[in-house]
Amino acid sequence: HIEHFYDLKKKLKKLGRQDLLELAELDFSVLFHYGRSDLSVDYNGAVVGPDEVKQIINANEKFSQTVKGFRLISYEDAQAHKHLMFAIELEADSTMDKEQGQSLLDDIVAKLQDINLDFKSAHRTAPIKPEIKIFKCGEGIFDQSHQKLKNDYVWNIDCKRAQKEGLF
């Protein structure tokens, strides 16, 4: 995002960081660039992050009350083909049949194509399309043994780990 120097100056003064203002030689706007971190996956050259997916799920009234959490999983199969999987954890006592799961996947993919032009291009040319796998609350990759202090939204894993986790 872009922060005008005047606004940045007010914020720094409020935070008691006059020392930083004294270092400024020019009063141009500042561009904050957020690079790729470990909180994204690569899909055929496009970067897909959990915030995009979370917004899409939360905006869909049909699924926002049913989905407890998710993971973006990038994995390789035995032939070294890259896959993108949306692993979905359901709320307790919620169910989702195959047709509903496909509907959720279709919604996620369509919305990602709308908001992420790199994804749109990647999806069009990708030999393997995104997948979805639905898990009951606290089961599979969302069970107690996979719990961490901080939610683990992204997995970049190899074939051996994907097989061990039962992803294919």
Q: What are these regions, as identified by a protein language model?
A:
Residues 1-168:
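AMP-binding adenylation
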